[in-house]
Amino acid sequence: MVYLSPKTILVDFLRKNITDPRTRITSTSDSFTATALQTSFSLSPTAGYSLSHITSVTVDTVASVKWQDYYIDFKNEKVVFFTGLTVGQAVVITYGEGTTNWIYPDKANKKLDALAFPRINILVIGSPGARLGNYEAPVEAVPRIQIDIWTKEKQDNQIFTIGGDKYTGEDLAEYIAYKITEAFEDNEEELFPALYGYDPVGMPPDLPFDDELQCHHKIVEFLCRGLKLGRTS
């Protein structure tokens, strides 16, 4: 059984639904012909690249549902179906790849080069839970998630044109923060059944400049829910 952190699920969601101003990610796809009862499909990113996120999976041209029909094994760059496929079925996996990324499950390191920004990280700052019945019932966890957005001050390599307008520094951090809230409001169903019940904890507040990282900083906070967190079954 693969360990599946809620942060891993959210990283995949954000990488898929938020456009990187620095365009570090490109799209590619792999095609397979399933063997009898095959469940695991290993991806083959371009040499020097690694898996960023899964965009879509089809089996005989029918879309499969992420976290319901299959899960992602990021460490081994695999898509794993919960139920074995039939011999001869055509599987097409479309995914993002890159030599680096910009959305991570860990906090930004102060040693990062300026070209590593903008950067987003995800923190679980609390996770109460309750058993939904007797001792055999599942536990529903309610993680409180904090998403940090880090952007550098205005300089030549930190000004980005988005939709015809230029963004940098605090302005860019705020723009990304609201695109994150929009992504959850518009695409929450992509998280189900792994996570559900998105509930925002206010809109992105103004925060002071971070002297340690020399970055502008915004946060997005919300609650969500999930059963058997950390497990694929």
Question: Can you name each region flagged by the protein language model?
Answer:
Residues 1-27, 44-80, 94-136, 187-195, ...:
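Small/polar-rich, solvent-exposed N-terminal microdomains that initiate assembly or binding
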Residues 19-24, 97, 135-142, 150-187, ...:
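Extracellular/virion structural assembly segments
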Residues 31-47:
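Surface-exposed ligand/attachment interfaces on beta-rich extracellular proteins
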Residues 33-38, 69-76, 208-214:
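Short, ordered beta-strand-loop transition motifs
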Residues 84-87:
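Surface-exposed, short loops/turns at beta-strand junctions within beta-sandwich domains
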Residues 115-121, 174-231:
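Acidic-leaning, charged glycine-interspersed low-complexity segments
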Residues 137-157, 213-228:
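Oligomerization/assembly interface segments of phage tail-like spikes and tubes
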